Design a protein with these regions (language model features):
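Bacterial signal peptide processing site
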Residues: 17-19
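Residue-level detector of transmembrane insertion/anchoring sites
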Residues: 7-8, 212
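GH16 jelly-roll
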Residues: 24-274
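Sec-dependent signal peptide recognition
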Residues: 1-7
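C-terminal motif of bacterial Sec signal peptides marking the signal peptidase cleavage site
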Residues: 12-15
Length: 274
């Protein structure tokens, strides 16, 4: 039995060695790309410094409105910061359980509304093409993991769904999901158990054009490479969304106490070739 285990482990060990050698190479390639082309910052943490800067770069709610696939309805505006607010360059989203009947979500699967929460989306869209072939999207988060909490940092199509790329998504546990949806059934998922997700961690995607139709999306947590997913996202504009849904895929019943989700050091940048 020991011999069999050793034989089985050998390919794994060689694979680990190969992966370890690839990771520095990826970082070097990305640095080389940045050096070779013009690098532009699209959004940075100055947009979390005050509401004037924030509202110049971000919209309140989802791009399509207040509802999505969970039991939270999003609230927020330039005059309503009960569920989305800024302090010391940190964005906080607060989900609060409601005690009255507010009907059901207008989005599939039309769950009963049990919470008020918050969502934001970028005014500028990510588009991978010949002019902007490389993008970096990253942010630091403190996330809740209580059953029923569903924080996310993700990209989704402006004109259709999919495309979708989930850079950070927790569903009521300490497991982060990094997903790429090419169709509703063609999905790549990389799951990582994060130690103390309620502490600050950095979630990052590097998106690079690799053909006339396809991109590679490299996913990272705290600077550690986790996976690369390939998808036909070239030329498809994407929103960047930060939100906290509740219940749904994250389980029920959700919390009765207020639930908090913090973000800082948001960064979106790209290379320009012309």
């Amino acid at each position: 039995m020991k011999t069999v285990i050793t034989i089985l482990l050998l390919p794994f060990l060689f694979a680990c060695q190969k992966t370890a050698s690839i990771k520095p190479s990826l970082q070097q390639q990305q640095l080389a790309v940045v050096a070779a082309d013009t690098w532009e910052t699209v959004i940075d943490n100055s947009t979390f410094a005050n509401y004037t800067a924030f509202e110049a770069a971000w919209n309140y709610l989802y791009p399509w409105g207040s509802d999505h696939n969970g039991s939270a309805r999003m609230y927020g505006s330039s005059t309503d910061h009960n569920h989305i607010y800024l302090s010391n360059s940190i964005l906080t989203i607060k989900a609060t359980r409601i005690t009255w009947d507010e009907g059901t979500s207008t989005s599939d699967p039309h769950l009963a509304i049990h919470y008020h929460s918050g969502a934001i989306n970028t005014k500028e869209h990510i588009v991978v093409n010949d002019q902007f072939p490389n993008w970096e999207v990253k942010c630091d988060f403190q996330v809740p993991t209580v059953t029923g909490s569903w924080p996310a940092f993700w990209l989704t199509g402006v004109n259709s769904w999919p495309p979708e790329s989930d850079i950070m998504e927790f569903k009521g546990s300490a497991t982060n999901w990094q997903n790429t949806f090419r169709t509703s059934s063609d999905v790549s998922s990389t799951l990582t158990t994060v130690s103390s997700p309620g502490s600050w961690h950095t979630y990052r995607a590097w998106i690079t054009k690799v053909s006339a139709t396809n991109v590679d999306i490299h996913y990272y947590i705290d600077g550690v490479w986790k996976a690369v997913h390939n998808a036909n996202f070239v030329g498809k504009p994407l929103y960047v969304i930060i939100n906290m849904q509740m219940e749904g895929s994250s389980g029920t019943p959700g919390p009765t106490a207020d639930t908090y989700f913090n973000a800082r050091n948001i960064y979106i940048g790209r290379t320009r070739t012309y």
